[in-house]
Amino acid sequence: MTKIKVANPIVEMDGDEQTRIIWHLIRDKLVLPYLDVDLKYYDLSVEYRDQTNDQVTVDSATATLKYGVAVKCATITPDEARVEEFHLKKMWKSPNGTIRNILGGTVFREPIIIPRIPRLVPQWEKPIIIGRHAFGDQYKATDVIVPEEGELRLVYKSKSGTHDVDLKVFDYPEHGGVAMMMYNTTDSIEGFAKASFELAIERKLPLYSTTKNTILKKYDGKFKDVFEAMYARSYKEKFESLGIWYEHRLIDDMVAQMLKSKGGYIIAMKNYDGDVESDIVAQGFGSLGLMTSVLITPDGKTFESEAAHGTVTRHFRQHQQGKETSTNSIASIFAWTRGIIQRGKLDNTPDVVKFGQILESATVNTVQEDGIMTKDLALILGKSERSAYVTTEEFIDAVESRLKKEFEAAAL
């Protein structure tokens, strides 16, 4: 079998625990036998991040800016227990957060719909894509414990000295409390809006943006104003010609409407809102194991894809004890395929794009047509008997078998 040549490199970011095991199986069984691809490898395991003082995370993001496409395995974000478990030098920051802050851009999370798998929200027939602004707000905030009575002030020193701000925020009573300062930038909000409008055009789906501008009149009002100005200036005519629309909604109203809808739209959300709501949407469509996550920069030139779930520690503990596991690898497979498809689009190599699509089709059809699935999906179908599901490895082997047939039939 002749391998398909991938014109330019893909950055590969390895990860932790059970997803690391899955990642290697996918790469070695489903990707490398079919593609002649230069993978620029970075080990983002928590041990190696610690060894390099997290420099490897920065290096992987820099490489992504250079080559344009990255695929990422799930990684551990250490807490106190993890620092102790791995004897880490310190509690390193979330690698996803570090990468997002270097790349900028917007994280779009989209469900993988398999008709056989029932949805918790049954009327969601079409995808709901959550666009999460991947910069600033709570994720780059400075927060403090206020130990005693005192005054909190908000101070901004402008470079020119003509727009300084010094505002009294609050007088703390005797026992103090907590305080937080967060920020965003006009450039980043504009980039977020552009990426959202561009995806809506590409997917021919209506776009909603959400804020709580009734409460945060200036902070959230800025997001609302940027989106509306950009839509009127650059996108209104394009949207109307495609029969789609843009609308701003209050976050609470949008969430309520979302539950009643049939799906089929994109919602652009601020960083925290998008973090929370994308998990709700994933569960509503069936499982976090059926959710893609891609980060796209506003110019569309830099792209990073990953699974939307964590490292599946519970299954990894079973694996360490020599017990069988049944871990859903679908989102990790799609992390690879979305990166492969994007690489093919950027390089204008249709065979690479087609291979990514065939691997996605083979993965979905392994469940949909062959009825082969991991335990989490069998449980959604109400089946807990051992014969209803396969092991982690058996599922990937079943996808491999189906991929061979679909690949040969496509005659690439």
Swiss-Prot record:
Keywords: Cytoplasm, Glyoxylate bypass, Magnesium, Manganese, Metal-binding, NADP, Oxidoreductase, Tricarboxylic acid cycle. Mn(2+) binds at residues 252, 275. Pfam families: Iso_dh (PF00180). InterPro entries: IsoCit/isopropylmalate_DH_CS, Isocitrate_DH_NADP, IsoPropMal-DH-like_dom. The record marks 139, 212 as: Critical for catalysis. Its cofactor is Mg(2+); Mn(2+). Its EC number is 1.1.1.42. Substrate binds at residues 77, 94-100, 109, 132. Binds 1 Mg(2+) or Mn(2+) ion per subunit. Gene3D superfamilies: Isopropylmalate Dehydrogenase. NADP(+) binds at residues 75-77, 82, 260, 310-315, 328. Its main location: cytoplasm. PROSITE patterns: IDH_IMDH. One of its GO terms (cellular component) is cytosol. One of its GO terms (molecular function) is isocitrate dehydrogenase (NADP+) activity. It catalyses: D-threo-isocitrate + NADP(+) = 2-oxoglutarate + CO2 + NADPH. GO terms for biological process: glyoxylate cycle; isocitrate metabolic process; NADP metabolic process; tricarboxylic acid cycle. By catabolite repression. The N-terminus is blocked. May function in the production of NADPH for fatty acid and sterol synthesis. Belongs to the isocitrate and isopropylmalate dehydrogenases family. Homodimer. Present with 2620 molecules/cell in log phase SD medium. This is Isocitrate dehydrogenase [NADP] cytoplasmic. It comes from Saccharomyces cerevisiae (strain ATCC 204508 / S288c) (Baker's yeast). The gene is IDP2.
